């Protein structure tokens, strides 16, 4: 009876999978876009130092509070936009970084330098010394339609080359997403998606089913 019950459960799971698959539009395929994009998305690791004030009840009676330096690491994603090593990412991924390290999809690692950044749009450009890289193709975000399938490609929680799928939930969203930290950095008119995005996805790619950056 246990074997029959397990078999029935397995059959039910398979049937559920088939029914979901049957509901997808004919010709819908994520694999081509995913395979085309993962080689264009990199893992970014940064190191920075901040000064924190150290308080001690005993010593503070005689001395002023002491400042101590503390090192910390951050990580995110980036998108290769040229064969000679220019990479776009979010400004908050590399902001105040003293060292920037880029790991490609093929596990090669490079030191990177900051070329330019714009806190207002939360964008930054970094550069690695490499040639013959796979650069992403650009789509036109104006052509993106609400309800259209898109893929989010990045490195959430340091899990490299992670792809999630969702739809475009809305366009031209206006929200000061960094307002709590940077009051002068409004991010406006961005694409909202329900694709799963986690810490570490910042700076990664949102692509259409042709593998084009939107």
PLM feature spans:
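General helical structural elements
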Residues: 5-6, 49
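Bacterial N-terminal signal peptides
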Residues: 6-17
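Serine-dependent protease modules
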Residues: 22-214
């Amino acid at each position: 009876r246990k074997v029959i019950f397990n078999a029935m459960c397995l059959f039910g799971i398979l049937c559920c999978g088939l029914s979901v698959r049957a509901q997808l539009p004919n010709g819908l395929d994520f694999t081509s876009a995913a395979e085309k994009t993962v080689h264009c998305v990199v893992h970014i690791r940064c190191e920075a130092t901040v000064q924190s004030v150290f308080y001690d009840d005993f010593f503070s009676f005689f001395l002023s509070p002491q400042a101590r330096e503390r090192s910390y690491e951050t990580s995110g994603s980036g998108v290769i936009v040229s064969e000679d090593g220019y990479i776009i990412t979010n400004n908050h991924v590399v902001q105040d970084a003293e060292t920037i390290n880029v790991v490609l999809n093929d596990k090669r690692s490079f030191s990177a330098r900051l070329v330019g950044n714009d806190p207002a749009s939360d964008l930054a450009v970094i550069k690695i010394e490499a040639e013959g890289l796979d650069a992403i193709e650009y789509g036109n975000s104006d052509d993106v339609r609400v309800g259209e399938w898109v893929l989010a490609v990045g490195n959430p929680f340091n899990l490299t080359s992670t792809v999630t799928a969702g739809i475009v939930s809305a366009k031209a969203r206006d929200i000061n997403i960094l307002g709590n930290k940077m009051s002068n950095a409004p991010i406006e008119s961005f694409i909202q998606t329900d694709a799963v995005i986690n810490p570490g996805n910042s700076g990664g790619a949102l692509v259409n089913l042709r593998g084009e950056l939107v």
